[in-house]
Structure formats: C-alpha cells, structure tokens
C-alpha cells in the first residue's frame, strides 16, 4: 500500500499580470502640452475678454501718448452700449476703407455722440442737442466747424482728444456698434502713468 495520498496535488494558479500603468509623457511632450494650453487660453482671453493695445499716434493727446500701453476689455459692450466719454477701440468703418483700401489697423477714439443725438462742432465747442459739452481733457479747442448732424441708430460719433490733429468722425462719419472691439480701461505702461482712464465728460 502506498504511503502517498491518493488525493490530487493542489495546482498553483498562474500568476496574473500586474495592471499596466499609463506611460508617462516625456518632459518634451509635457512642455509641448503646457505651451499648447497656454496658447489656447491666451487666444481665448484675447478674443473674448481683453487684450493689450498700444498708441501709435498723437490723436488722443493729452490723454494718451504715443507708445502708451492699454488694456481693452471686451465684455461690457455685450450687455450695455458705449457711453459718452468711453475711449473705444474699433475696426475701420466702410467709409474709412473706401478712403484708404489698405487700412486694416484698429482705431482708438473717444465716444462723443450717441445714437439719435444731434451733434455740432462750432465756436471751439461740441454741442450735443444744442447743449455745450464740458471737455477739460482735450489738447485744444477744435478750430473747425462741423454739423449739425444726427447720429444714426446703432452708431457713434467719435473724436480724438487732440481735436485738430485727429482723423475721426468729422472726416469719415460714424462708427457702427458692430465695429467696436472694446473699451480702453487701464493704462499699464509707462508705469509712472499707470492707472484707470478718466470718467466720461458731461454737459
């Protein structure tokens, strides 16, 4: 009689492979992903929220000087129309393009006339519906005569603060609301002039 047990010998179950770990990206790939995400976020902010702009000319003296850097916000005009005194950045109008077909740079001017208002420039003053506009921010009183004209619906009359050296609405007409990019809110350069841009004028 055999001394060994007749019961079957237990079998060791085969080893199960360990769960595979996701392969870590190389430092180069991580860097590319980070840069890509940063670019997407920057483009989104620039398109929908705000962007930086610089001043290329003297047309907004003394408020804005050549090479000033500004932040232009793009959100508020989706909810409220521009106000008198806002400093806006806008795409060239059709009238501007007709005068200069190669023109594609954005303009920056101050909103003076609102839709439905009658505007006149006479005697060195701007009149809104016959009432003089108080303007303590202009370089010098305008030396030209213009109007009276009624501002069309959904359009704005804009003038440079340097009234006698500004290519603005008194040359080429009104800015449709759809052309407006946004409102200049803060000057961030040069640092000695950093701050919010001034309140709107009154009359």
From Swiss-Prot:
One of its GO terms (molecular function) is serine-type endopeptidase activity. Residues 1-26 are annotated as: Disordered. It catalyses: Cleavage of hydrophobic, N-terminal signal or leader sequences from secreted and periplasmic proteins. Its EC number is 3.4.21.89. It is found in: Cell membrane. The chain crosses the membrane at residues 34-50. Residues 17-26 have a biased composition (Low complexity). This is Signal peptidase I. It comes from Leptolyngbya laminosa (Phormidium laminosum). The gene is lepB.
């Amino acid at each position: 009689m055999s001394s060994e047990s007749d019961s079957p010998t237990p079998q060791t179950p085969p080893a199960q492979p360990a769960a595979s770990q996701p392969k870590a990206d190389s430092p180069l790939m991580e860097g590319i992903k980070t840069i890509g995400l940063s670019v997407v976020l920057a483009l989104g902010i620039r398109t929908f929220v705000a962007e930086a702009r610089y001043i290329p000319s003297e047309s907004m003296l003394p408020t804005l000087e050549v090479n000033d850097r500004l932040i232009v916000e793009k959100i508020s005009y989706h909810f409220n129309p521009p106000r008198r005194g806002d400093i806006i950045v806008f795409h060239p109008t059709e009238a501007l393009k007709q005068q200069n077909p190669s023109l594609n740079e954005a303009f920056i001017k101050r909103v003076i006339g609102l839709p439905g208002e009658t505007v006149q420039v006479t005697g060195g003053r701007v009149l809104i519906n016959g009432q003089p506009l108080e303007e303590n921010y202009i370089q010098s009183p305008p030396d030209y005569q213009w109007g009276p004209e009624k501002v069309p619906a959904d359009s704005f009359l804009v003038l440079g603060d340097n009234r006698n050296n500004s290519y603005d609405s008194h040359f080429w007409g009104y800015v449709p609301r759809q052309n407006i990019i946004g409102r200049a809110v803060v000057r961030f350069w040069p640092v000695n002039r950093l701050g919010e841009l001034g309140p709107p004028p009154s009359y």
